[in-house]
Amino acid sequence: MISFREENIDLNLIKTISVICNDPDATDSSSDDESISGNNPRRQIKPKPPKRYVSKICVPTLIKRYENVSNSTGNKAAGNRKTSSGFKGVRRRPWGKFAAEIRNPFEKKRKWLGTFPTEEEAAEAYQKSKREFDERLGLVKQEKDLVDLTKPCGVRKPEEKEVTEKSNCKKVNKRIVTDQKPFGCGYNADHEEEGVISKMLEDPLMTSSIADIFGDSAVEANDIWVDYNSVEFISIVDDFKFDFVENDRVGKEKTFGFKIGDHTKVNQHAKIVSTNGDLFVDDLLDFDPLIDDFKLEDFPMDDLGLLGDPEDDDFSWFNGTTDWIDKFL
């Protein structure tokens, strides 16, 4: 049987052993017991007091001890063995090598990394495998956070609301469709706003007061023609009782006239042109003979005779000439 001992000694921790004696060279003999010396046997001689000798021995501290015993049947461990290691995932085998293993987060079980001769190599294998798992976990997390940009954006259905509006003649029930903007990925609100503004500039609309008087209108690209409803206009005039407007009858048709002079007749159908300046100027030339007979002080507009040709397609002056209609309505 072959046995060997492995010891680990810490030189920083030293124990001191003190050895105390009277004669470090003393031996066991009969002469040491003799207390009488000389010719006179009765004379006693006092022995000298013994000296005290102190000897110190310094011994280092033993931290751990391994004792292995080998025989024909195999190796058996004798004493306590340390199987754990200072590195995570590394364990020491009974025969002195180090095993490394790591937990697989995807399969929920341990993965064997192998056996290494040194503790550092086993720890390095553990860290390498841990980095691989961390990279795979990061990629999986990024895939979950990705959004599919190829899918169309969702658009809510428009909501309809009934609104009752009061006008000068009658109550109008309108169904208003609330515009819902699209939402989701890839939607830009700036482009939507620019499209709405450009559409408003391309399609001119009448004011609400003119639309209520003359009814629905057909909107064209360049001109807006308003169909004149004589019966509805007569009812409005009768309700407000204008002093300078009266109803005249010529044959079976009903026309409008003004109390200025003996005779003044206005055609039954009037056309209002808002965007074509040339047509409006031609209409004014047709009315010049009638305007000469009118007393302009009866009208709230003083610049009717001062109207000229439009410059640079600016028709803002036309809005001023129709303000008297809104005023009396």
Curated annotation (Swiss-Prot):
GO terms for biological process: ethylene-activated signaling pathway. Pfam families: AP2 (PF00847). This is Ethylene-responsive transcription factor ERF117. Residues 25-51, 71-90 are annotated as: Disordered. InterPro entries: AP2/ERF_dom (IPR001471), AP2/ERF_dom_sf (IPR036955), AP2/ERF_ERF_subfamily (IPR050913), DNA-bd_dom_sf (IPR016177). Belongs to the AP2/ERF transcription factor family. ERF subfamily. Keywords: Activator, DNA-binding, Ethylene signaling pathway, Nucleus, Transcription, Transcription regulation. It comes from Arabidopsis thaliana (Mouse-ear cress). GO terms for cellular component: nucleus. The keyword Ion transport does not apply. SUPFAM superfamilies: DNA-binding domain (SSF54171). It is found in: Nucleus. Residues 86-143 bind DNA. Residues 71-86 have a biased composition (Polar residues). The lineage of its organism: Eukaryota, Viridiplantae, Streptophyta, Embryophyta, Tracheophyta.
